[in-house]
Regions:
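The substrate-binding groove and active-site-proximal loops of carbohydrate-active enzymes
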Residues: 83-106, 123-132, 185-192, 224-235
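Substrate-binding/active-site clefts of carbohydrate-active enzymes
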Residues: 1-109, 113-116, 164-165
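Active-site-proximal helices and loops of the catalytic beta/alpha 8
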Residues: 2-27, 31-35, 39, 112-115, ...
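Generic, ordered loop/turn and secondary-structure boundary motif
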Residues: 51, 82, 88-90, 117, ...
Length: 247
């Protein structure tokens, strides 16, 4: 990673990493030492109709980095997040150890990025797959950003309901995605599937009692899911009016 727009004095991610080590508490990335990254078979950059001299199925990354979805191999599959890189928030994932004191270098780099945008007037952040980032980091960084704006809103995209309460109470998030919960309970009802039941919806609502419900961001559409009026969902938006009352 090499930024062409970073403020003076800012160090790029990975610029000071020891790439001979698979893991170091001081590294920003996780590495596959002495292995070159291999572009997954079937990759069709730009689509089949796109042609370019640089479209040769190769990408120079040596040593290969671990992917954002934790693939510790230089040969991720086409279904892996091979175009992303796992950031080191202080956890040695392969050996089950953590190094959180002193604060890992990635923590301060990410804080500086968030503060940069907060100082420009951004008043909220939607954090992609926030549960892949240790809750200890959020507990530390969210108050740091709120020094700029005490009303800063943090929304977590997360898919593990068992983590919701902790990411709100300890992590400091304002809202958690209610996808694996109310959305997944409502969709079968809207589609009138044979096994759809209000009992599933009731179970979700009861599991969010005790104040958690106020921190759930509910929806019937987002960029990852089917459009409401699509053939695979409600077919007609009118069929989802009742569900909209709950979301």
């Amino acid at each position: 990673y090499q930024s062409d727009a970073k403020p003076a004095g800012v160090i790029d991610f990975g610029a000071q990493d020891d790439k001979t080590k698979a893991y170091s508490p001081q590294n920003d990335y996780y590495y596959i030492p002495e292995k070159n990254f291999v572009v997954p078979a079937g990759t069709e950059a730009g689509g089949a109709q796109f042609n370019h001299p640089l479209k040769d199925g190769k990408f120079d990354e040596n040593p290969a980095k671990v992917t954002g979805n934790n693939v510790f191999s230089e040969k991720p599959s086409i279904d892996d997040w091979y175009e992303t890189m796992k950031l080191n928030y202080g956890y040695d994932l392969q050996n089950g150890k953590n190094y959180l004191d002193p604060v890992p270098p990635v923590w301060t780099k990410m804080r500086d990025i968030l503060v940069f945008w907060a100082n420009k007037g951004v008043d909220g952040f939607r954090c992609d797959v926030a549960e892949f980032v240790p809750v200890e980091f959020w507990h530390w960084v969210i108050p740091e950003v709120r020094k700029i704006n005490s009303n800063m809103v943090f929304i977590a995209e997360a898919y593990d309901p068992s983590k919701y309460a902790n990411y709100v109470s300890y992590g400091g998030f304002n809202y958690m995605y209610d996808k694996v919960g109310l959305y997944d309970a409502l969709k079968p009802l809207i589609k009138n599937e044979a096994n759809a039941t209000v009992a599933t919806m009731r179970k979700v609502i009861q599991s969010q009692e005790g104040g958690l419900s106020n921190h759930m961001l509910r929806f019937l559409e987002n960029h990852d899911e089917e459009r409401l009026a699509s053939k695979g969902f409600a077919q007609k938006p009118e069929f989802a009016k009742a569900a909209m009352v709950l979301t």
